[in-house]
UniProtKB/Swiss-Prot annotation:
Gene: nusB
Alphabetized Gene3D superfamilies for the sequence: NusB-like (1.10.940.10)
Family under the similarity heading: Belongs to the NusB family.
InterPro entries, alphabetized: NusB-like_sf, NusB_fam, NusB_RsmB_TIM44
Entries under Pfam families matching the protein: NusB (PF01029)
Name assigned to this protein: Transcription antitermination protein NusB
GO cellular component: cytosol
MF annotations from Gene Ontology: RNA binding
Function of the protein: Involved in transcription antitermination. Required for transcription of ribosomal RNA (rRNA) genes. Binds specifically to the boxA antiterminator sequence of the ribosomal RNA (rrn) operons.
HAMAP family to which the protein is assigned, alphabetical: NusB (MF_00073)
Organism, as annotated: Sorangium cellulosum (strain So ce56)
Keywords of this entry: RNA-binding, Transcription, Transcription antitermination, Transcription regulation
Top-level taxonomy: Bacteria, Pseudomonadati, Myxococcota, Polyangia, Polyangiales
Domain of life: Bacteria
Annotated GO biological process: DNA-templated transcription termination; transcription antitermination
Length: 140
């Protein structure tokens, strides 16, 4: 698994902890890395994502709301909601990362940590977010 992949997995765990525990993102990040080893590149990416999502939470959640018209954000499973936040933030802030990579990685995290339906749900919502943002893969 590459550094960004491991970073995304760590970021998901931290985003989940931020929401579940009510602690600030910087506090969760500091605690997480005291208890969990990680390579420097993966750690840096995870930290950037977690802090970025926390700082841009209103915009990230609004992008998710617009793309998931049949699901209220508050009613989504916590894992799905945080995978969507991670993927939406990347789509909004990391234009150098291909759309397909962001979606594939998010779907894999959703399948690993979510329910049986999580992968398809996350794929559909993130695909709509990408379209709303005008993110198109060049090789499509």
């Amino acid at each position: 698994m590459g550094a960004r992949s491991t970073g995304r997995e760590a970021a998901l765990q931290m985003l989940f902890a931020v929401e579940a525990g009510g602690s600030s993102a910087p506090r969760v990040v500091a605690t997480f890395w005291r208890e969990t080893p990680g390579d420097p590149e993966g750690r840096a990416y995870a930290d950037e994502v977690v802090v970025g999502v926390a700082e841009d939470l209103a915009a990230v959640d609004e992008a998710i709301r617009k793309a998931s018209t049949n699901w209220r954000l508050e009613r989504m499973a916590r894992v799905d909601r945080n995978v969507l936040r991670l993927g939406a933030w990347e789509l909004m802030n990391r234009p150098e990362v291909p759309r397909a990579v962001i979606l594939d990685e998010a779907v894999e995290l959703a399948k690993r940590y979510g329910s049986e339906e999580s992968g398809a749900f996350v794929n559909g919502v993130l695909d709509r977010i990408a379209e709303n943002l005008g993110r198109v893969d060049r090789d499509r």
